[in-house]
């Protein structure tokens, strides 16, 4: 992930991994026509972005997305960001840094 590997490297990796897993599902004892993907924080963002890219490229369709507190906006001026931006594990300034390196 960023900053060492800027966007869209992480999205490209996720989509490639999904395509590989679906194409080789039988090898893993799974059904490639029935799969779910999910992630938390940046992983939630990558999950949603992967599903959208696969849709746009007529790729495999996930049956379920599990999006746990995904990072879906770079708007750091939202009331919830300002109200909860200090004293937590991820501060407002840290999130700005992450977004600037995405």
Question: Which stretches of residues belong to each language-model region?
Answer:
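Alpha/beta-hydrolase superfamily serine-hydrolase fold, recognizing
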Residues: 1-102
């Amino acid at each position: 992930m960023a900053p060492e590997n800027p966007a869209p490297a992480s999205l490209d990796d996720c989509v490639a991994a999904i395509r590989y897993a679906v194409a080789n599902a039988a090898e893993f004892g799974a059904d490639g026509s029935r799969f779910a993907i999910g992630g938390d924080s940046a992983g939630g963002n990558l999950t949603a972005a992967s599903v959208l890219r696969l849709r746009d490229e007529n790729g495999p369709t996930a049956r379920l997305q599990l999006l746990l507190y995904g990072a879906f906006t770079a708007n750091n001026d939202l009331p919830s960001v300002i109200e909860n931006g200090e004293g937590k594990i991820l501060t407002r300034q840290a999130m700005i840094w992450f977004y600037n390196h995405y």
